C-alpha cells in the first residue's frame, strides 16, 4: 500500500510540474503558428470582401489577418515572402461599417497600425513594410488567421 501511495504521489508531482508548462501550440497542416494563432497565405487573388468571406470559410474563427504588434507583422511579412512573389496582400483592417472608424474584420481592437493613410480597405506591401489604402475592388492574395 505504501508503494502505491508513493507511485501515485510521484505521478501527481510529474503531472503538476508539466501542467505548469505551456504545451506546444499546433496548427492544422499547411498553417503556421505564431503566438497562439494560426496563419496561412493563399495565392488566390480576390477583392477584400471576397477575401474576408474566403477566410471565414477556411476554418472556424478564421478571418483576414489582423496584426496587433510589430513582431506579429514581421512574422506575417516573412510568411508572405516565403510563399508569394506578389508584394501586396489583403489585411483585415477596414472601415467595416462605413462610419469612418477603422476596425479589424475579426472585431479585434485596433492597438497597432502601420498605415500610410486611412481609407476603406487596406493591403500590406511586404517589401515596403507598410499598409496602404486601396479600393476594395482591388485584386490581391489573401492571408487568413485564426
From Swiss-Prot:
SUPFAM superfamilies, alphabetized: C-type lectin-like
Signal sequence, start to end: 1-23
Cysteines engaged in disulfide bonds, as pairs: 27-38, 55-144, 121-136
Domain of life: Eukaryota
GO molecular function terms listed in the Swiss-Prot or TrEMBL record: toxin activity
C-type lectin domain segment(s): 34-145
Any coiled-coil regions, as ranges: none
GO CC annotation, single: extracellular region
Entry's localization field: Secreted
Annotated Pfam families: Lectin_C
Similarity comment: Belongs to the snaclec family.
Name assigned to this protein: Snaclec 4
Amino acid at each position: 500500500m505504501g508503494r502505491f501511495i508513493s507511485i501515485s504521489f510521484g505521478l501527481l508531482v510529474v503531472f503538476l510540474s508539466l501542467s505548469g508548462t505551456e504545451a506546444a501550440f499546433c496548427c492544422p497542416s499547411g498553417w503556421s503558428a505564431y503566438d497562439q494563432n494560426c496563419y496561412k497565405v493563399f495565392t488566390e487573388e480576390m477583392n477584400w470582401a471576397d477575401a474576408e468571406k474566403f477566410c471565414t470559410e477556411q476554418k472556424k474563427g478564421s478571418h483576414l489577418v489582423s496584426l496587433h504588434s510589430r513582431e506579429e507583422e514581421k512574422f506575417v511579412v516573412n510568411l508572405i515572402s516565403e510563399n508569394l512573389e506578389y508584394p501586396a496582400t489583403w489585411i483585415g483592417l477596414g472601415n467595416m461599417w462605413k462610419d469612418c472608424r477603422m476596425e479589424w474584420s475579426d472585431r479585434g481592437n485596433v492597438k497597432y497600425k502601420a498605415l500610410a493613410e486611412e481609407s476603406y480597405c487596406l493591403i500590406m506591401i511586404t517589401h515596403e513594410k507598410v499598409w496602404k489604402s486601396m479600393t476594395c475592388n482591388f485584386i490581391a492574395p489573401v492571408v487568413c488567421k485564426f
